[in-house]
Regions:
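Gly/Pro-rich hinge or "lid" segments in bacterial periplasmic/extracellular proteins
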Residues: 83-86, 93-94, 193-252, 257, ...
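Ligand/substrate-recognition segments at binding pockets and active sites
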Residues: 236, 265, 359-360, 382-449, ...
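N-terminal lobe/hinge region of extracytoplasmic solute-binding protein
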Residues: 50-111, 142, 224-226
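Ligand-site clamp/hinge motif
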Residues: 121, 217, 245-291, 411, ...
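Surface-exposed binding/hinge segments that line
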Residues: 119, 154-207
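Long beta-strand-rich cores associated with HINT superfamily self-processing modules
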Residues: 521-543
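Extracytoplasmic/peripheral linker and loop segments enriched in polar/acidic and small residues
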Residues: 325-328, 340, 370, 416, ...
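Structural transition elements
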Residues: 229, 349-383, 398-404
Length: 543
């Protein structure tokens, strides 16, 4: 089984389950969480975390979705990590524009941007007693690359011709040197991804080793980690128990024990949050979370600086979207405010541009939202020269209530400008295939980059002729700028390039950005510390 062709984006915690689109790999109907009675005010009791979807794998080198790598990352360290900044309601949140050392004590970058030298702490050990050293980091990165799953794409920043990484050298136990084939200002963020986690070679070798392009079944449900938590027990699709690693090289985590329940039944999620059985609930539908807004049981926290968005794809190779005037017209025929209020319960931000508001490259001035203006849309349709009425079929995932609501609302407004929209509900596999095989005439989608950086995003989402470019966007002038920004290391010049790409993107109206999604977490009144990161980081969570 190979995953090298998997699209390099992440499925959103708190969104996928909220949409009712549960990955088939999760198998069972979940669990009722009956074992979560230990939640409450006792600080010595386990922290109980309910998550709406179970991971398909916990191997950081193989996982693609946030449910996979977000859970898995807590058992491992990486050379770097995201910085932190203040969040809403007294919480903190990750800062994608600030990358800091994690396992590395120091980082030196050569003047030409090609050679990275990492100094590592001495004496760190895996639970097996093996050293967590430069050889372990080298082995782990090379394992991820050789397996050729999503992890390899993340570590390479999506750059394969030539491969971003030229050589990895363990000069001594505390010195690791990585040489690149070309400068890449985003490389330190690539190393902050769970895909760059440091694994115990002795455990992997004893349990299947590395096979190029293939999954390691043992690592799919076991940890071989170096991180803040040990995996004490794991029942796939049901629950997991994590205990603080007494030999962790860094600061001990805030919680000594965390009980994770995987629950895909939203009424159960809501009941356990309201009753106090769960300390932290992730993935509850916004409708349910909205019912808790004024409930003294809980604190509902919405992080606006998220990096995911709800979109309507209008593939350029399909009529009528090959006409830029038609593409522009439909962007003015979407009642954004109504959708944000009725569908997202206010937990969303309107904008129009290639970068989400939570991304460092976002420029608010260049990303002003399109207004709902039917008369302007009608005028643009007339200017397009396209005869109306036009029949368009939009694919949505079956059971996805949010995207069905969006499609239904748009169906009504587009009728006013001469577009008859047929809503086609597809089973999950058929829906994904219709996009990845570029068969869909239009589609709804929740999207966002696996690595939260503009160059990485543009490298798969906008380049002409890239199969990952699901809407077949093609702006040749922008392609040249994307190639330039991928190798530019000066922050000011990079932002200038990102801004110019945004201008070109907006001019072409390549798709509809319905809204930037806010991530909603529900915390019990006993939770004192919570940190939002698009990949769950349990280290500071506690009560």
């Amino acid at each position: 089984m190979t995953r090298s062709n998997a699209r390099p984006v992440l499925l959103v915690i708190g969104t996928l389950a909220a949409l009712g689109l549960l990955v088939a790999a999760c198998g069972s109907d979940g669990d009722d969480g009956a074992a979560s009675d230990s939640a409450g005010g006792d600080a010595a009791a386990p922290l109980v975390v309910n998550i709406a979807q179970a991971p398909a794998t916990i191997d950081p080198a193989w996982g693609c979705g946030l449910y996979d790598i977000g859970f898995a990352q807590n058992f491992y360290v990486r050379l770097t990590q995201y910085g932190s900044k203040p969040g809403p309601e007294g919480t903190t949140q990750f800062d994608p524009g600030n990358i800091e050392p994690y396992f590395a004590e120091s980082i030196d970058i050569s003047e030409d941007g090609l050679v990275y030298t990492f100094k590592l702490p001495a004496g760190a050990k895996f639970p097996s007693g093996e050293p967590v050293d430069a050889d372990a980091v080298k082995y782990s990165l090379e394992r991820t690359i050789k397996m050729a799953g999503c992890g390899g794409y993340f570590v390479y920043d999506g750059i394969y011709e030539p491969p971003l990484i030229k050589e990895i050298e363990a000069q001594d136990p505390t010195t690791l040197v990585i040489t690149l084939n070309q400068p890449n200002a985003n490389f330190l963020q690539d190393l902050a991804q769970p895909a760059a986690s440091v694994v115990d070679e002795s455990v992997v070798a004893a349990n299947g080793g590395i096979e190029e392009g293939k999954v390691n079944e043992y690592m799919s449900s076991n940890a071989a980690g170096s991180g803040p938590f040990l995996l004490e027990s794991y029942e796939p699709n049901k629950r997991a128990v994590l205990r603080a690693n007494p030999d962790f090289f860094g600061d001990p985590p805030a919680s000594k024990e965390i009980l994770v329940n995987f629950i895909n039944a939203d009424p159960t999620m809501l009941l356990q949050a309201r009753s106090g059985q769960a300390d932290i609930s992730l993935g509850m539908t916004k409708q349910s979370a909205n019912s808790l807004r004024d409930d003294p049981c809980c604190k509902v926290v919405a992080n606006e600086d998220t990096t995911f968005w709800e979109l309507i794809g209008t593939p350029w190779k399909k009529k009528p979207w090959d006409n830029v005037k038609v593409r522009e017209a439909v962007t003015y025929a979407v009642p954004y405010d109504e959708i944000i209020e009725k569908v997202a319960y206010g937990w969303a931000t309107a904008y129009y541009g290639p970068y989400a508001p939570g991304m460092a490259e976002f420029n608010e001035e260049l990303s002003q939202p399109r207004e709902f203006d039917i008369e302007r849309a009608k005028q643009l349709m007339q200017e397009s020269g396209v005869a109306t009425p036009v029949d368009v079929t939009i694919n949505i995932p079956e059971g996805n209530t949010i995207e069905e609501q969006i499609a239904t609302i748009v169906q009504g407004t587009w009728r006013e400008i001469g577009i008859n929209l047929k809503i086609n509900k597809l089973a999950s596999t058929d829906y994904i295939n219709s996009m990845e095989q570029h068969k869909a005439q239009a589609f709804t989608r929740i999207d966002g980059p696996g690595v939260v950086e503009g160059g990485y995003l543009l490298g798969y989402d906008m380049l002409c002729g890239i199969s990952f470019n699901l809407a077949d966007i093609c702006i040749e002038e922008a392609d040249k700028l994307i190639a330039e920004v991928r190798t530019e290391t000066d922050p000011t010049k990079r932002q200038e390039l990102f801004d110019e790409i945004a201008r070109l993107w907006v001019e072409q109206s390549p798709r509809i950005q319905v809204y930037a999604d806010h991530f909603v977490s529900v915390l019990s009144k006993n939770v004192k510390n919570y940190h939002y990161q698009h990949e769950m980081d349990f280290r500071t969570w506690g009560k």
